[in-house]
Amino acid sequence: MLFRSALVVTIVVLLILAGVSINLVLGNNGIITKAKEAAEKTAEAQEKEMTERNLLEQELENSLATPTPKPQPTDGVKIPAGFYYVGGTKTSGIVISDNENDKDKYRNKAVVGTDLLGNQYVWIPCTTDNTSSELQYTRTEWGVEVDGDDNSRAIKDELTLTDASVTYSDVDTANGINADVSKEIVAQIKAEKASVAKYGGYYIGRYEVGKNSDTAVVKYNQTPYAEITWSTAYGLAKKIITNSEATSYLCSSYAWDTAVNFIQNNSTAKNYATSITGFNGNWNSQEVKDPSENVIKPAGTSQQLNTGLTTQFCNIFDIGGNEAEFTTELNPGTSETVVLRGGGYYYDYPAGYRWDCSSGYAYVDYGFRATLFLK
């Protein structure tokens, strides 16, 4: 009886051990299952290693290959922070705007439209290297008025404003033109030249400065910011841009003359500096037509037009005609200190002509233009 009981126990134990062994081999966590999982993981690791190796080989191959450069419409021209490339080329006039919605709107197109939202400037490529055949950043003398009580010439290089011979009349000092301002202007011209030497050009306002409430803007179809003295225009221009990469100035004689030469070299306006004929600009004797050939200002009339309603050259409007424009060119101590440029709707003076007025004049046909120089 005892033998039979022991046999039963032995059989039960063997059965239990057999079940455990089978479970170890065939169960969910059994040896076969684990071996299968290990094989799958090994295959996955090998496949991942092969993929990564192929990627590395491709990257190495790409790095050794000579890349095909993508055409860049800005052609190395630096766009300052807060501005965006709109359109144009180095020869037709690269246009930038401070509104991101204008970005690339006329990409790779020579002529840029006026349907933009931001303040706009045009790149003038030039150099200070006088051994170069490229456009020089320099002054050019075309027509010059000679008049006034002292029969003075309306021309003076800004870099001579700190010469010992320079004096200031009571009218000058009463209207903010003095030795300190002259020092500022000399420093401005030197900074402009340094910027051009470093970056190969500068930006000029696409339009005459307009007035939106009391804000100075450089946009299409704005009332020109006029009826202000030279000193007010000088101060406003310096505040148009507050930027870590660019400084705004009242246009200098260097910037003005270089822009006129750029237009003559790169557009149909070959004699823009010395003539008013055939340019659809707002001069007294000329009629002005809109793009649909409708006359918006008859010939023989004096009428201020909003910015950008005439014909552009190199994507720049009204360098000749509309407002007479203040620059940093001054001739202190003479009967008429302030030099004006660009003709005007009361006159028939061409874009390159220089004439002058008193430092206290603030007329509706006297405006100004801003420039941007990269830091």
Question: Over which residues does each language-model region extend?
Answer:
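Acidic glycine-/aspartate-rich tracts in secreted/extracellular proteins
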Residues: 127-131, 208-214, 328-333, 345, ...
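Short, small-residue-biased leader/transition segments that mark boundaries at the very start
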Residues: 1-2
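Short aromatic-cysteine micro-motif
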Residues: 117, 147-318
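Membrane-proximal N-terminal amphipathic helix
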Residues: 30-63
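Short, glycine/small-hydrophobic-rich surface segments
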Residues: 54-69, 273-287
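Disulfide-stabilized, aromatic/cysteine-rich ligand-recognition loop
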Residues: 227-235, 241, 247, 251, ...
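C-terminal juxtamembrane segment of a hydrophobic transmembrane alpha-helix
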Residues: 14-36
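GGW-centered surface loops in extracellular recognition modules
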Residues: 67-133, 248
